[in-house]
Amino acid sequence: MEVDGETQIEELECDIRTLRKQLKAKVQQLKTLKKHFQKNCINKLNNNEIARYSRQIILSEIGVQGQLKLKRSSVLVVGAGGLGCPSALYLAGAGIGRIGILDYDEVELTNLHRQLLHTECSVGLTKVESVRSYLEELNSQIEIVTHHIQLTSDNALQTLESYDIVVDATDNVATRYLLNDACVLLKKPLVSGSALQLEGQLTVYNFNGGPCYRCLFPNPPPPETVTNCGDGGVLGAITGVIGALQALETIKIILGNSGVLSGRLLLFDGHQSTFRNLKLRPKKADCAVCSDNPSLTKLIDYEQFCSMKATDKDSHLNLLAPHERITVQEYKSLAESNVPHLLVDVRGANQFEICQLPASINVPIDDILKNRRTAEVTQLAATGGPVFVVCRRGNDSQLAVRHLSQLFQEQGLAPPRDIVGGLHAWTHNIDPEFPIY
């Protein structure tokens, strides 16, 4: 009897696998048929589309002709993260005929508080496939195209040229310049958004005679002054607000509506829940890329131009000489030998509360750079022995060491040293149970 039961289980599992394969094949056939049907029906709305989009079709700003414009349009969303997820979601819901999703990354647990098209089951999957799966379940009437690549000067023009509008939902400076220049060369509007901490910004570049990104920022900022979500943090609802507004601006461009944020910058303050609308400087007459006589007529090496990587991943600064730094292994050996020293943790107080190394004192980086507590640090250093500086990933600690070195030298103190890689390196190389965030 027991053998028969095991046999039945195996047979059922085999049947289920077969049915799943058949279902997958049928689903693919259905998608292919729908795409073929939709391509041949771009001049009218079917009954399903009329019912689905009825609440926006009845708006005088849209109507049937407006919905057909949306159906015939194509939008590329660059970045499937905090901004890209809500933007793609509302574009798909509105009935954009073809939506491209471009991202090189995979879903991580740290994404889920703000990138709400991904789920716990998506962790480890590519972001583009995770978004595609969600959007196809939301709206099977539209086409979702995935680009699992990192955008570069070599592939940008070819990738962007088949879309009407580009949505910049990225989080790094080099890619912003790349997207701007590519959109100018291809004569495509660029809907640009950003979000950090509890604030967000939104504008539209290269549209209706308005400025491009280079008109406003001809030169990139120094790498050490740039903060991304990984360093500065962000509240998920902020990215939701800005991402949804990016979708709105995109829809307005497609419909030909007035009021597009070209030449204007929308600022959102999540602290006070207020919006401000600022007028931007006009198009620059001598802009390197969008002027009548541009000096840039092809894409360049943007990582070299910006002196930073074209990636949303946390960057690693290299500001100090080797003798000004110490590895986590070296620091562990020193601490276990009970050598007198002072360990200064320059993270913010809220981050220090999450986790800290034994005997460390918290002096936030802002208090050091603005000389609010440097006297305190030098006094402790005079009696506590050599100073080692740590932060989350080893960037702010370098800034702190660079700032403190001159003060220490003036007072005859041993120079401070940075712990390479910060607390992330401690978790990876010393204590895997130490919290990482």
Curated annotation (Swiss-Prot):
Q: In which pathway does it act?
A: tRNA modification; 5-methoxycarbonylmethyl-2-thiouridine-tRNA biosynthesis; Cofactor biosynthesis; molybdopterin biosynthesis
| UniProt cofactor note | Binds 1 zinc ion per subunit.
Upper taxonomic lineage: Eukaryota, Metazoa, Ecdysozoa, Arthropoda, Hexapoda
Q: Where is the Rhodanese domain?
A: 337-435
Q: MF terms per GO, please?
A: ATP binding; metal ion binding; molybdopterin-synthase adenylyltransferase activity; molybdopterin-synthase sulfurtransferase activity; thiosulfate-cyanide sulfurtransferase activity; URM1 activating enzyme activity
Top-rank lineage group of the source organism: Eukaryota
User: SMART domains per the record?
Assistant: RHOD
List the InterPro entries. MOCS3/Uba4, Rhodanese-like_dom, Rhodanese-like_dom_sf, ThiF/MoeB/HesA, ThiF_NAD_FAD-bd, Ubiquitin-activating_enz
Q: Output the Gene3D superfamilies linked to this UniProt entry.
A: NAD(P)-binding Rossmann-like Domain (3.40.50.720), Rhodanese-like domain (3.40.250.10)
One GO cellular component term noted in the UniProt record for this chain: cytosol
Q: Name one Pfam family in it.
A: ThiF
| Active-site feature positions | C229, C391
| Binding positions for Zn(2+) per the UniProt entry | C212, C215, C287, C290
Q: Which UniProt keywords apply?
A: ATP-binding, Cytoplasm, Metal-binding, Molybdenum cofactor biosynthesis, Multifunctional enzyme, Nucleotide-binding, Nucleotidyltransferase, Transferase, tRNA processing, Zinc
Q: What does this protein do?
A: Plays a central role in 2-thiolation of mcm(5)S(2)U at tRNA wobble positions of cytosolic tRNA(Lys), tRNA(Glu) and tRNA(Gln). Also essential during biosynthesis of the molybdenum cofactor. Acts by mediating the C-terminal thiocarboxylation of sulfur carriers URM1 and MOCS2A. Its N-terminus first activates URM1 and MOCS2A as acyl-adenylates (-COAMP), then the persulfide sulfur on the catalytic cysteine is transferred to URM1 and MOCS2A to form thiocarboxylation (-COSH) of their C-terminus.
Name the predominant localization: cytoplasm
Tell me the residue numbers annotated for binding ATP: G82, D103, T110, N111, L112, H113, R114, K127, D171, N172
List the EC numbers from the record: 2.7.7.80, 2.8.1.11
The similarity annotation says: In the N-terminal section; belongs to the HesA/MoeB/ThiF family. UBA4 subfamily.
Name the Gene Ontology biological process terms.
Mo-molybdopterin cofactor biosynthetic process; protein urmylation; tRNA wobble position uridine thiolation
Q: Which cofactor does it need?
A: Zn(2+)
- Official protein name in the record: Adenylyltransferase and sulfurtransferase MOCS3
